[in-house]
């Protein structure tokens, strides 16, 4: 199993959708939200700090889906995912 800690910005257009759960569960990943800044009445985008656990292939697939939805991603790791 591989792990990857990422930070991501979720555009406010996804505020009322279960984006994180849907994408990460569909890629068979476990995820732990380490920190978040998001609320139903906020006008800004939301931010999450998450730890992903799964196969390298599943992590790569989830990151591709998130990028396709215009989610900005940051990671402190040198690993290529």
Curated annotation (Swiss-Prot):
Q: Which domain of life is it from?
A: Bacteria
Flavoprotein as a keyword of this entry, yes or no, is no
Report the InterPro entries cross-referenced here.
ACT-like_dom_sf, NIL_domain
Keyword field contains Transport: yes
Keyword entries, A-Z: Sulfate transport, Transport
| Similarity-based family | To Synechocystis PCC 6803 ssr2439.
Q: What does this protein do?
A: May have a regulatory function.
Protein name in the entry: Uncharacterized protein Synpcc7942_1683
Q: Which species does the entry assign this protein to?
A: Synechococcus elongatus (strain ATCC 33912 / PCC 7942 / FACHB-805) (Anacystis nidulans R2)
